[in-house]
Amino acid sequence: MKKIMFIVMMGLSPIGFSGPVVEIYECQINKGKTLEDLSDMMNTFSAYLKKAGLSNSYKAHAGFQQIPIKPGSVNWIGISPTAEDYGKAIEWFTSSKDGQAFGELYQSVYTCQESFMTFITTSSK
């Protein structure tokens, strides 16, 4: 019985101790848009998060791809400290007027092709 409990606990430990949630979108800046438009969009996003009380639940970073170099690339990197915080951010994005307005804004600035999400389970020290 102890062996079974140990196996179950080991199997559940990554779930209980998983760290931040990271999502990455590989995007291209839309024709006629500039990095200044991207910066303005990020400022708007920060204001929306603050208004919604989500500043500590989700942080976004945007940058261009270095290797290999892709002209016009924009990578969106979103980080939430926990899965619960990520859920709060997604709920805001999909069900609030500000979230939907931001969706329209970002789609006017860039278009995304690929994305992935990961849970950080361990990190270097």
Model-derived features: where do they sit?
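Positively charged n-region of N-terminal signal peptides that target proteins for export
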Residues: M1-I4
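Short S/T/G/P-rich N-terminal loop/turn motif that feeds into the first structured element of a domain
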Residues: V8-M10, P14-S96, S108-K125
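Non-heme di-metal
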Residues: F102-G103
